[in-house]
């Protein structure tokens, strides 16, 4: 099952929507998640996908906190589960391989232009509480996916702290399921996106977003768009199909200097992942 997430920065030009359709076709996407798609343009995108796929694609639920919309192949049994979260929503996907439902959480967290890192750190426990409450209702905290724009790098405090996303870079650690801190048990997420950091990492780029400032501290490449997995899904992640997409049908999404080609496109790059479920 192929998933793709892209923060499209409210770009709904005809040319760009055609590129999204081409990307869906080229990468054989089953579940397409688009962030910052204006509500008034959802139907346009849905109709374009239906036309391209001969009515084999449809929209799932509404906008997640007015930020993210999901489209999926008719072959995928996916439905909204809880859309009451702030900046996050939950969906259920039926897995024939696992013979159970998998939870898909889609997130678009607060950005750093309007929210400080300290403020993000204060808000992230609310996301964690929402996830754990939904998992409790589902009766399963081992088969969850979180995907989206976290507006944070994998190494930031909110992403790694026990009271936050508790997302680790090492699959063997994540497979332990939980760890105890000061007498309280915390459940792990596995974050495979760590593997893209640096020139020696996976793929062609070190992040999904590029920003150059005149500040003394600047990373330039930021890995804001990520996927996290609970331990029950680790063996089903196809590492070879985890990618930051940099081309669509031969057209480069990067400039000659290696930064993101934002004109007519988006300031984020899309991410693709595959779960053999």
Language model: regions and residue ranges:
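Surface-exposed cleft-lining segments at the edges of enzyme active sites
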Residues: 109-124
């Amino acid at each position: 099952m192929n998933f793709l997430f892209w923060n499209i920065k409210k770009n709904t030009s005809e040319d760009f929507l055609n590129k999204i359709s081409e990307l869906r076709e080229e990468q054989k996407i089953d579940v397409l998640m688009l962030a910052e798609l204006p509500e008034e343009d959802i139907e346009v995108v849905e109709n374009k996908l239906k036309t391209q796929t001969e009515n084999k694609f449809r929209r799932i639920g509404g906008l997640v906190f007015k930020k993210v919309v999901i489209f999926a192949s008719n072959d995928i049994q996916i439905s909204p589960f809880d859309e009451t979260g702030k900046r996050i929503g939950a969906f259920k996907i039926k897995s024939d391989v696992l013979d159970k439902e998998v939870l898909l959480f889609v997130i678009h967290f607060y950005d750093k232009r309007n929210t400080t890192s300290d403020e993000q750190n204060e808000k992230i426990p609310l996301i964690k509480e929402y996830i754990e409450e939904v998992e409790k209702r589902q009766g399963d905290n081992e088969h969850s996916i979180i995907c989206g724009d976290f507006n944070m790098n994998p190494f930031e405090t909110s992403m790694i702290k026990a009271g936050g996303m508790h997302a680790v870079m090492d699959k063997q650690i994540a497979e332990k399921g939980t760890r105890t801190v000061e007498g309280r048990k915390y459940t792990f997420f596995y974050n495979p996106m760590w593997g893209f950091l640096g020139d020696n990492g996976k793929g062609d780029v070190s992040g999904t977003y590029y920003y150059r400032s005149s500040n003394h501290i600047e990373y330039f490449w930021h890995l804001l768009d990520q996927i996290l997995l609970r331990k029950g899904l680790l063996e089903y992640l196809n590492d070879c199909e985890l990618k930051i997409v940099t081309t669509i049908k031969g057209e480069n999404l990067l400039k000659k200097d290696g930064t993101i080609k934002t004109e007519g496109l988006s300031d984020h790059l899309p991410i693709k992942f595959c779960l053999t479920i």
